[in-house]
Amino acid sequence: MADIHEVEHLPAEYYSDFISTAAKERKPSPIRNLLPLEKVPGVISLLAGKPNASTFPFTSLSFSARSPTDPTQESTLTIDGAELEAGLQYGDTAGFKPLLDWIFGLQDALHGRRRGEGWKVSMGGGSQDLIYKAVNVMVDPGDSVLVESPVYAGVIPIFHSLHCNLIEVETDAQGIRSSSLRSILEEWPADKPKPKVLYTVPYGCNPTGATATLERRKEVLKLAREHNFIILEDDPYFYLYYGKEPRYPSYFALELEEPEVGRVLRFDSLSKILSAGIRIGFASGPEALLEAIDEHTATSNLQTSSLTQAIVYKLLDSWTYEGFRTHTEMVSEFYRQKRDVFESAMRKYLTGLAEWSQPEAGLFFWFKLLLAENEGKGDSEITIKTKAFEKGVLALPGTHFLPNGGPTPYVRASFSLTGEEDVDRAVRRIREAILDVREVNGCGVKVSGERNGAACY
């Protein structure tokens, strides 16, 4: 990877065209913009309406956590004194400084991004919160946006709320098909503005489970430079990679090899590796974009919870980066075993009735139901929502992951929570539902052998 100091960083003014009209018109919070000045030595602040910490009833917070190196061992961590006071008080919009500092170090260690090189980090109430704000500060109503298809269902309403024109980029088992993306951009009408953003989940994509290969990532980055768009890299399953090959570099890391740096806005989540309910995620990317997101935060929810950030920092600081790495490796191995159990049941019950590709990261199987002799036909909606549910199993029909809707024979199934016996029962019930529909369609069980190895998008 090229030395970061040899790379040209896009200037702040470059991002003016990527900031939405609403974000440009948003008036900054007069109080929050001045809060950093309270820390200037000698300044007596009469600025903020902060409650006096002496009135808070909490005096100490202790919690126990498993050791990342020995899960049978626990340690008790305590937050009190000035640490607790900071956790109970209003804090900086971008985040709790000790945690921000820790995250800066993490992004340096994992992605090769050094602090002070034109990028910053902001905390959010989960990565979903940050994605919502990023879209709103970058996209104007009616804009065309590039989204991989199938796509994470949680972003579709965000784009729909802005009446966006969702341009579907084809994917397969290797991630975004760069040939599809190139065709879209090269054939774009000359009288219409090109999309400013591309949304993608490169590791263990939700719903497909696909992980983008290194070659595909490089091709997408090249197209981002050629056609001038920002990659929204939503990577909640980055730490849940369990493939046989070494983990591919992120877009955030790979862009250091580009002639210019600053076309990736990255979203990380602690939900899958520490706690979903603690609601903490962080965004890393160009300062101009993160500052616009911070302005949105300052006039909406003000900040991410200081207390949850203080708890997370206390834990991570006690672990060190090495302990964090060990913990995430343990989590990814846990889900690899879950994947294998689920796939074993699929081979047992769905051979000849479904097609799938084995995921290398994440929590999901994405499989195609063979509901009729014509394998290109079929709609999983009735099979899953009605037939399968009547038999006692819930899964999600694939239509909910298509940016512009429509029938599809695909289904998403999560394997994160279910034990081995329930997995066996659930997949057997899906088999029974498929057979019921095939009988209505006048076909029986397919006997041509296992089909799971094919890329089936």
Q: Where are the regions that the model predicts?
A:
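Conserved glycine-rich beta-strand-loop-beta hairpin in the small C-terminal domain of fold type I
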Residues: 328-343, 353-372
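Conserved core of the PLP fold type I
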Residues: 69-228, 232, 238-259, 265-269, ...
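N-terminal "arm"/small-domain region of PLP-dependent enzymes with the aminotransferase-like
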Residues: 2-98, 105, 390-393
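Conserved PLP-binding active-site segment of the aspartate aminotransferase-like
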Residues: 285, 366-376, 393-428, 433
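Short catalytic/ligand-binding loop motif for oxyanion handling, primarily in non-cytosolic enzymes
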Residues: 52-59, 206-209, 239-242, 274-276, ...
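Conserved core segment of the aminotransferase class I/II
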Residues: 256-336
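Short Gly/Ser/Thr- and Asp/Glu-enriched loop/turn motifs at secondary-structure junctions
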Residues: 116-118, 358-364, 406-408
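Short beta-strand segments
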Residues: 45-48, 168, 199-202, 232-235, ...
